[in-house]
UniProtKB/Swiss-Prot annotation:
Keyword Cytoplasm: yes
Reaction(s) the record says it catalyses: L-threonine + hydrogencarbonate + ATP = L-threonylcarbamoyladenylate + diphosphate + H2O
Gene, per the UniProt record: tsaC
Family to which the UniProt record says this protein belongs: Belongs to the SUA5 family. TsaC subfamily.
Protein name per UniProt: Threonylcarbamoyl-AMP synthase
Listed EC numbers: 2.7.7.87
Entry-linked SUPFAM superfamilies: YrdC/RibB
Length: 190
């Protein structure tokens, strides 16, 4: 996608996000749907769209670690744990961090932790940088259907008018690996 088209697509996506609505965008493996993590209205719309219970918790995807810091508590990390995490970021590995009490329950669900990732997908990096914060990110698929890997698949599942940032996925076959930031325990194989 040329720079002007990408810039226009990102600007249009930010307009939708500012309206507390949900967008779709390519990630490392599949298309994701996401919204403003600070908007309970937007997150509830996303959960309703996905038919996902709020108690499961969500993932935030960001352009850089600084964008994630308001949502996580990294004070318990040792230098070795921090080095391990930073050696995997940016990239397709999601880490579950302790969450401070200020992190909204619509993000953490029933947990006192939050799953977060610093992406290396150039379009998502540009989107998060332009928006100035991370996005809620979950796979773009309706309950019971496979995750979307193309714009056409997103539109087939969510409708022709659904706001999609066009682009290619990163080509990975599987969604991101998920690990505990403190213990390194593998929750989901990537």
């Amino acid at each position: 996608m040329n720079n002007n088209l990408q810039r226009d697509a990102i600007a249009a996506a930010i307009d939708v996000l500012n309206e507390e609505r949900v967008i779709a965008y390519p990630t490392e493996a599949v298309f994701g749907v996401g919204c403003d993590p600070d908007s309970e209205t937007a997150v509830m719309r996303l959960l309703e769209l996905k038919q996902r219970p709020v108690d499961k918790g969500l993932i935030l995807i960001a352009a850089n670690y600084e964008q994630l810091k308001p949502y996580i508590d990294d004070t318990m990390l040792t230098d070795v744990q921090r080095e391990t995490i930073f050696s995997r970021w940016p990239g397709p590995v999601t880490f579950v961090f302790p969450a401070p009490a200020t992190t909204p329950r619509w993000l953490t669900g029933r947990f006192d932790s939050l799953a977060v990732r610093v992406t290396d997908h150039p379009l998502v990096v540009a989107l998060c940088q332009a928006y100035g914060k991370p996005l809620v990110s979950t796979s773009a698929n309706l309950s019971g259907l496979p995750p979307c890997r193309t714009v056409d698949e997103v539109r087939a599942q969510f409708g022709a008018a659904f706001p999609v940032v066009p682009g290619e996925t990163g080509g990975r076959l599987n969604p991101s690996e998920i690990r505990d930031a403190l213990t390194g325990e593998l929750f989901r194989q990537g």
